[in-house]
A protein has these predicted regions:
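Short linear motifs at protein or domain termini
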Residues: 1-55, 169, 173-177
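Conserved amphipathic alpha-helical segments that form helical-bundle/coiled-coil interaction surfaces
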Residues: 50, 55, 59-126, 139-148, ...
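Short alpha-helical transmembrane interface motifs in multi-pass membrane proteins
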Residues: 31-32, 124-128
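Solvent-exposed loop and edge beta-strand segments that line ligand/cofactor-binding
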Residues: 130-134
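Short functional linear motifs
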Residues: 32-35, 62, 154
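Short secondary-structure boundary/capping segments
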Residues: 17, 135-136
Length: 177
């Protein structure tokens, strides 16, 4: 029981669950307003991390991005028996791809905040799947981001990552309203 309380306390500190006095815990609400603020913060931090990674990254970093993109593009997006549910192998490969993009960033605080924002956005990403499958080419979005980053084109990379994130936000917001 102590381990469960500790886990719930940690999830509460991360904003994923809400503690209710004398009533236990509930999963934090999702809302278009929360998603818009989260996306705004995430885009700003992600772009800063990308800028630093592009400035500092070398051949190993580029190789890691190409490998992560290859892995992601060869991983099933949704569950074979339920196309409305993300395949957890894809979720892991997606996380690794986005981590690889910024892995050459040398500011650990920016990376830490980026990781927290990524984790927060995951629950919204899960919501986007049944709403958007036909109207978006996520694989092409990832290729565009990787191409811009490896080309060291900061403006194009920042625009591509922002578009990628705001597209998810738009899809979820439409579904929530």
């Amino acid at each position: 029981l102590g381990a469960v309380r500790e886990a719930l306390s940690k999830l509460s500190a991360e904003g994923l669950v809400d503690a209710r006095a004398q009533r236990g815990y509930t999963v934090s609400d999702v809302s278009p307003e929360d998603l818009a603020e989260l996306t705004d913060a995430r885009v700003r931090i992600e772009q800063e991390c990308l800028k630093l990674a592009i400035e500092k990254g070398g051949l190993e970093w580029e190789t890691d991005i190409v490998a992560a993109l290859h892995r992601l593009s060869h991983t099933p997006y949704t569950m074979p028996d339920d196309p409305a549910v993300l395949d957890q192998r894809w979720v892991k490969a997606h996380r690794e791809f986005h981590r690889a993009l910024v892995s050459a960033c040398d500011n650990r605080w920016l990376l830490r905040i980026r990781g927290q924002l990524y984790d927060q956005s995951e629950r919204y990403r899960q919501l986007s799947v049944p709403l958007a499958r036909a109207e978006r080419d996520v694989a092409q979005e990832h290729r565009n981001i990787a191409d811009a980053v490896i080309a060291r084109d900061v403006a194009r990379a920042c625009a591509a990552i922002a578009s990628h994130m705001w597209t998810t936000t738009q899809i979820v917001t439409t579904g929530l309203t």
